[in-house]
Amino acid sequence: MKKSPDVFVIAFSLIILAAILTWVLPGGAYEREQVKVGESVREIVKPGSFHTIPSKPQIGSIFTAPAHGFLKLGSIIAFIFIVGGAFNILNDTGAIAAGIGQLVQMLQKRTYLIIPIVMTVFSFFGGAFGMCEEAMPFALILVPMAISLGYDSIVGVCMSFVAAGVGFAAGFMNPFTVQIAQGIAGVPALSGLGYRLVVWAVVTAVTIAWVMAYAARIKANPQRSIMFELDQARRAELEKSAAQHQRFTWRDAMCLVILGIAIAGLIVGVTTLGWYMLELAGLFLAMGVASGLVAAMGPNRVAKSFIAGAKDIAGAALIVGFAGGIIVILENGQILDTILYGMASVTSRLGGVLAAQSMFLLQTVLNFFIPSGSTKAVLTMPLLAPLADLSGVTRQTVVLAYQLGTGFTSMIIPTSGVTVGTMALAKIPYEKWVRWHWPMQVVFAVLSLLALIWPALSGWS
């Protein structure tokens, strides 16, 4: 069997490709202006202001791009290191293994209910609050749970990362995509909520059905899993840990209470206090230290466990830096606006349903180069909203095309620090994730194209 290239080989190859593009494509830029969107001021592009500028080839920056990527995505990298260390402390307490054992005993033959319940919750958080990076640490809980239930690590990642990603993409009130895009497009905040709820419900249901069908196949025959060999070692570790912690003690219960408090703190902090990566890193660090002390591990053992966890997750932090390097090359080469201008020019020639669907495809392609949803909103919505008026579709439809094109492919592109970071946390090689996940991306694309037909034909606003 031909061996797939390592994720670092893929990332560095993309850095080289991005550098070559800075030689091939002409430099270009839109003029920017500051506008108030909601309670914040954002810098958006001015329609019709594109002009060529001298290109800045980045061939000489190929080897410095990863370091610049570390600086650009430093908060995510710090988050990964601290979360990896903190959850390793929690894992070493044995509370996770003991808790999973208790859960399996309680549910007995109803363990299949865990998948739809957990996925619905994460999808709701993605759709309502824009949960994305915040879902990363849950892979460290749900992957071991999935393996203990007889599934594989893919199912564990789907329960949190994919579910939150689907909710983020089809979000009905996502503050980082829907609300920003509506503000820039001049559409009333949270308008069109009814149809967005329908789209979210359909996409979430299809995703849950897909994952449950896959999980049933793996439980019936574990060797069908693309992760079978890699999961075997983790399964053995979980069984060993469960054997060592056959009794569910009060210390285990207290550690799980601390975990629950941390999760509640995450929800409150993100939704009401404006917490982001650094605050959440501090929250999980406190959780790890507290659980270690409650489990009577002692300060030195807690420190050693934290270092071991951070060391184990170093590859995740490194690959995030490489992914950031790709974006740095494109930004410094001043070709992102050129790419945006070229794609918008193609979209402007279409009308009706084709216009709406082409805008979705435009956002999908741009997502590789600009994986940030809010950044893409301020870049593309000032251009596409006026195009909507000329193409015979509503601006509300353009917002929907934007959010669908922005969200789904974020779960597979190598330029997303969240994606490559989550895969590393879950110990799923990126190339295996792509092999497993790409058919789901095809389904998401078809659902998105279908979801845009009614709004384009009905004048949805």
Regions inferred by a protein language model and the residue ranges of each:
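Long, contiguous bundles of hydrophobic transmembrane helices that form the permeation core
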Residues: 2-4, 8, 33-41, 194-305, ...
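C-terminal transmembrane helix pair
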Residues: 5, 347-461
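Core transmembrane alpha-helical segments of multi-pass membrane transporters/permeases
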Residues: 7-16, 42-97, 275-338
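Hydrophobic core segments of alpha-helical transmembrane domains in multi-pass membrane transport
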Residues: 10-24, 80-88, 121-125, 167, ...
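Short helix-coil transition sites and intra-membrane helix breaks within transmembrane domains
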Residues: 72-76, 87-98, 126-137, 168-173, ...
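Hydrophobic alpha-helical transmembrane segments of multi-pass integral membrane proteins
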Residues: 81, 110-141, 320-330, 345-386, ...
